[in-house]
Amino acid sequence: MSDDRDIQLEAEKQGVFLTTMQRFYNWGRRSSVWPLSFGLACCAIEMMATGLARFDLARFGAEMFRASPRQADLMIVAGTVTKKMAPQVVRLYNQMPEPRYVISMGACATSGGPFRDGYNVLRGIDLLIPVDVYIPGCPPRPEALLHALMTLQKQIDAQRLNRVRWYGKREAKEYPVPAFGKHGLEIDGKLVDPVGGLPLISPYTSPTHGEMRSGEIEHPELVRHFPIMDETVELESPNKAKGVAPEIRHNDLKRPAVEVDHARDEQR
């Protein structure tokens, strides 16, 4: 083993570098991750700042924001995903060539953020497409986005070509594009995320090593495991939940109680 190492060091002194095909392939992909020009809300402002001279995204080979999904490797979901915008996000993702990656930037893209109890906000983009790296924050700083990019590069370095689906002659996988129906998001005519209700679909897990994930539509009559809410939440109907969210019930929002002085109001 030491003899092989000595031979490699001697060859490097002569300008000859020895490596494996897999490492060389991964090095090329990790060094030229081109993001899609795609922003949704305030997190997109921080994404724009990351591409400026102060943070110098070009050091990582990711400064080439492409205007077409056909030329992009990375989708940065930067901001709140509304249920009307969700079909467009999935459609853009399907148009990206494989291998393709997703960074969920900010609390809104990851779980709905402060708007998660809103009737029109998707509670995490991983309900519809797989996510490789999550960035917490509201909004995250450019340094956090750089750290996410470096994390993604490490994941790319660790990929094995014989395990990933997209290497070879296997067909690319397209994810179902939801339609905004009468009561919310629908896939193949089945309600998966009702307006004002709870998601009826489980999230995808990270595709770091190329395995396929869940994303199964769970039948409304069966017991569901909600990706955000706890399992004690019950539905009165497919469009309405019983009670309130656990965060509100346990006062996790830490909102101070508002006391009203009626006597003072009467004096006025």
UniProtKB/Swiss-Prot annotation:
Residues 237-268 are annotated as: Disordered. GO terms for molecular function: 4 iron, 4 sulfur cluster binding; iron ion binding; NADH dehydrogenase (ubiquinone) activity; NADH:ubiquinone reductase (non-electrogenic) activity; quinone binding. One of its GO terms (biological process) is aerobic respiration. It catalyses: a quinone + NADH + 5 H(+)(in) = a quinol + NAD(+) + 4 H(+)(out). InterPro entries: NADH_UbQ_OxRdtase-like_20kDa, NADH_UQ_OxRdtase_20Kd_su. Its EC number is 7.1.1.-. Residues 247-268 have a biased composition (Basic and acidic residues). It is found in: Cell membrane. [4Fe-4S] cluster binds at C42, C43, C108, C138. It is an enzyme of class 7 (translocase). HAMAP family: NDH1_NuoB. This is NADH-quinone oxidoreductase subunit B 2. It comes from Roseiflexus castenholzii (strain DSM 13941 / HLO8). The gene is nuoB2.
